[in-house]
Swiss-Prot record:
Belongs to the neurotoxin 08 (Shiva) family. 01 (omega toxin) subfamily. It comes from Hadronyche versuta. GO terms for biological process: defense response. GO terms for cellular component: extracellular region. It is found in: Secreted. Expressed by the venom gland. This is Omega-hexatoxin-Hv1c. One of its GO terms (molecular function) is calcium channel inhibitor activity. Inhibits insect, but not mammalian, voltage-gated calcium channels (Cav).
């Protein structure tokens, strides 16, 4: 029903991503955020 989250966008869970994979990544500010792979 809901559209999947594209690669590189913030995500809560793996299932939300088009790739079915949401992992912690470091951004420019050095903060760690979960984004779709």
């Amino acid at each position: 029903s809901s559209t999947c989250i594209p690669s590189g966008q913030p995500c809560p869970y793996n299932e939300n991503c088009c790739s079915q994979s949401c992992t912690f990544k470091e951004n420019e500010n050095g903060n760690t955020v979960k984004r779709c792979d």
